[in-house]
Amino acid sequence: MLPDIQSTKGDGEGESLSWVGMEQIDLPIDIAGRPVSAKVNAGINLLSSPEAEKGIHMSRLYLLLDELTQGEITPALLQHVLKAFLVSHQGRSDEASIEISGDLLLSRKSLNSNHSGWKAYPLTLSAELRQSFTVTLKVGIPYSSTCPASAALSRHVAGLQFSKDFGNRIDRLPAAEIADWLVEKGMPATPHSQRSWAWVDIRLNPEAKSLPVLELIDYAEVALGTAVQTVVKRSDEQAFAVANGQNLMFCEDAARRLNNVFRCASFCEAFDIRVEHQESLHPHNAVARIHWKGSKNVT
């Protein structure tokens, strides 16, 4: 018989450990019907006992993780695997967790032209079995943000330039001449905008039967109105410029928009939202966060 060192008595009178397991395990995962090349962290706690073994049997957890590759990930499947973790270490553990990270690739349509392209959304799916079972889903959504203050300053410059070019003729200008001026000189200053990120971290409703990844992304992109594009023709770029002009946002505005949407989402029991505007004006980022736990929030 081969020696089993892990099953020998540990040092320190069997001191308990809050988490023991493996990180960065490669697994092919199906999330929302899409394949994801995932990195998985999996582990359990180790209870204190005078007769406690030195460590856990990681191979048991590793083999059980293969069940996650046999079909689409659901809350029920995650709970089943976590329960199997505890059964595999009966009497030595009463807590288990799984964390799955990867990029979800989605095909997204252009704003105006009849084209589609692929966009990656980073996500982290976490499941814990302690006194109760909980699932959290965190997704990153890239979008564009145009600064309202910069837009106002740009309009002010345009107004000054208009007055300078036309002086006392303003009241008598033909519409066609104004239109020509707007085309050629109507934008002497442009507001600054930047690629931005919304990180939406939700705790799923316990009654959820599936992972609402697509709904989460769609809710966020509709609320923000300026989702980063994939394939872009000129008509799409113009539509994107219009969308940015109609959705001027400070980071505070973006956070509040998302707050309003996810408070009403039936699949969401609580959330932690972080928005990050990667400023083109500054060498630092503008960030806002909002938490909601069902009855109160802290901004």
Swiss-Prot record:
GO terms for biological process: tetrahydrofolate biosynthetic process. Its EC number is 3.5.4.16. Pathway: Cofactor biosynthesis; 7,8-dihydroneopterin triphosphate biosynthesis; 7,8-dihydroneopterin triphosphate from GTP: step 1/1. Pfam families: GCHY-1. Keywords: Hydrolase, Plasmid. Disulfide bonds: none annotated. Gene3D superfamilies: Urate Oxidase. GO terms for molecular function: GTP cyclohydrolase I activity. The record marks 147 as: May be catalytically important. Converts GTP to 7,8-dihydroneopterin triphosphate. Belongs to the GTP cyclohydrolase IV family. NCBIfam families: PRK13674.1-1 (NF010200). This is GTP cyclohydrolase FolE2. It comes from Klebsiella pneumoniae.
